[in-house]
Amino acid sequence: MVAIIKLKEHFSDEISDKTINEFKNLLSDKSYIENASLLFDTTKKIITFSRSSAVEDVIIYYKKYVDKVTCCHSLPLGEGKKFAEDLKKNMISSQLIEDGELSRFIPDSDFMLLGADAITEDLFMNKIGTLQAVLLAQHFKKPVYVISSPLKKIKKSDYSLEKLGQYFEAIDNSLITDFIY
């Protein structure tokens, strides 16, 4: 949905080679990988919730600094299971936990990494259950970082919170340690 909003925003005035190339650059922008380097000064234990291609890109790129990734199952759709399996295929130590076990594993982690389906000036949208995970991380004083392509940044006025659907929720940006683009 965000990609369609960005298309509309990007080409509202004109379609030219320049605007097409600018949009292609936006689609392929993975600057978040380099910008995440500040997180990996030493070996880390990471908690994730749901599945994000940006988070996966970062973990794979910095895998020599990753001790273990704990992936929440992220029910009801269970994206965390496939994420944990894919990390193992990339020779990254990972474990799958049930969402309700998160409070047992956060204390031993260094930080939580999340992706986002959309990011506005006040909120970000992600899989249902993300808010609970973020609040648990705060309780245990663990930083939470959202890794995202700049493509996911949109104006709040362009996003309909009513159309989030049953599998997504809005989380206040003030709960996040930092957004890495």
Model-flagged regions — what are they?
Residues 2-97:
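N-terminal active-site beta-alpha-beta segment that forms phosphate/nucleotide-binding
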Residues 73-181:
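Conserved phosphate- and dinucleotide-binding cores of soluble alpha/beta proteins
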